[in-house]
Amino acid sequence: MTAEKKYSNGLQLLATFVWSKSIDDSSQADWNVSWLGSIDSLQDPNKPWLERSLSTFDIPYVFQLSYSYDLPVGHGRAFMGNMPRWADLILGGWKTNGVWRMSDGRPLTFTLSDGGQPLPTYGSQRPNLVGTPKRNHGADWVDNYFADPNVLQRPAPFTLGDAPRAVGSVRSPSHFTADLSVGKQFHIREEMNFEFRVEAKNAFNHPVFGTPDTAVGDDTFGTINYTSVGPRQLQLGFKFNF
């Protein structure tokens, strides 16, 4: 779904919302992205249909808002249009742009910490589900991501676990970022100008946490030890157009 405000009064907006669901039996789409999985993740070669589950890249909700806004200050604009030339050179003619993105997380894939049992399988062996995995919403969720980690159990000897390839009842943390910029063109003469920009990636320095350890039996099971988006980055840009 898309909503757009075409450029008027210095403002242009574009908002998109995606609601989707992806199901497959092998999620690899890029050999360079290992977490997508592949035929190598087939747990039981005699029952390949058990691999059918949510795609490991399934993200149900994605909202994105982008905008471009000419600040209404300076010559030819709504406010302070009669300011002296030197003041307009500093205060007038600025433009800001931004992209805001919010999305749900991906379903989690659970494995066994030691690789599982000596059985003829192609890929990682999975645990048993004795309940529904849920996320811990307490203050300690980064160190204890799962509300009840005991709903994931190691299978009995010489058996394979019944957990699906991707579990949708618990997902990786949601995603929120805002990339913003502000800039101005300084006109030198006709068809010649100098452009200055300040850009901020993850402008609000909002932490986007990565996926918790999902290997049942690990000492760090349920712990998140990295972020998937870096801290705020500021960048200055200069461009001479002619």
Model-derived features with residue positions:
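Short, solvent-exposed micro-motifs at the edges of structured domains
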Residues: M1-F242
